Amino acid sequence: MKFLALFFLALAGVAFAHDGGMGGMDMIKSYSILGAMIGLGIAAFGGAIGMGNAAAATITGTARNPGVGGKLLTTMFVAMAMIEAQVIYTLVFAIIAIYSNPFLS
């Protein structure tokens, strides 16, 4: 049941992408929005898993050796920034795919 609700929620972007009267262009725009949503969802999901693993490893390392907690925290922040950068790159790609799609011009 949850998968069905998620499926219909994902297709809501396709329903809102319909402008009417554009011929085949509305299909390209619909698939651009759907692809952007799926890509951004996968990137955010993977980033969240990576951030959770990084935080768990940092907490475990600090619990085992409190003396290196500061160095581990700095390394964790760098890793978090790199993980978040991948999600931001996917967001930029999704925005480009939606608003400046070369197949729509």
Curated annotation (Swiss-Prot):
- Site: Reversibly protonated during proton transport. Where? E84
| Record has Membrane as a keyword | yes
Q: Which UniProt keywords apply?
A: ATP synthesis, Cell inner membrane, Cell membrane, CF(0), Hydrogen ion transport, Ion transport, Lipid-binding, Membrane, Transmembrane, Transmembrane helix, Transport
Record membrane topology: Multi-pass membrane protein
Indicate where this protein resides in the cell.
Cell inner membrane
Gene Ontology molecular functions: lipid binding; proton-transporting ATP synthase activity, rotational mechanism
Mainly localized where?
membrane
Q: A single Pfam family, by name?
A: ATP-synt_C
Transmembrane residues, as ranges?
Answer: 3-23, 32-52, 78-98
Gene Ontology terms, cellular component aspect? plasma membrane; proton-transporting ATP synthase complex; proton-transporting two-sector ATPase complex, proton-transporting domain
- Coiled-coil spans in chain: none
Q: List the disulfide bonds.
A: none
Q: Which InterPro entries would you find in this protein's record? A: ATP_synth_F0_csu (IPR000454), ATP_synth_F0_csu_DDCD_BS (IPR020537), ATP_synth_F0_csu_sf (IPR038662), ATPase_proteolipid_c-like_dom (IPR002379), F/V-ATP_Csub_sf (IPR035921)
Spell out the SUPFAM superfamilies in the cross-references: F1F0 ATP synthase subunit C
Q: What does this protein do?
A: F(1)F(0) ATP synthase produces ATP from ADP in the presence of a proton or sodium gradient. F-type ATPases consist of two structural domains, F(1) containing the extramembraneous catalytic core and F(0) containing the membrane proton channel, linked together by a central stalk and a peripheral stalk. During catalysis, ATP synthesis in the catalytic domain of F(1) is coupled via a rotary mechanism of the central stalk subunits to proton translocation.
**How is the quaternary structure described?**
F-type ATPases have 2 components, F(1) - the catalytic core - and F(0) - the membrane proton channel. F(1) has five subunits: alpha(3), beta(3), gamma(1), delta(1), epsilon(1). F(0) has three main subunits: a(1), b(2) and c(10-14). The alpha and beta chains form an alternating ring which encloses part of the gamma chain. F(1) is attached to F(0) by a central stalk formed by the gamma and epsilon chains, while a peripheral stalk is formed by the delta and b chains.
Tell me the HAMAP family matching this sequence. Answer: ATP_synth_c_bact
The similarity annotation says: Belongs to the ATPase C chain family.
Instruction: Please state what the protein is called.
Output: ATP synthase subunit c
Organism field: Helicobacter pylori (strain G27)
Name the gene.
atpE
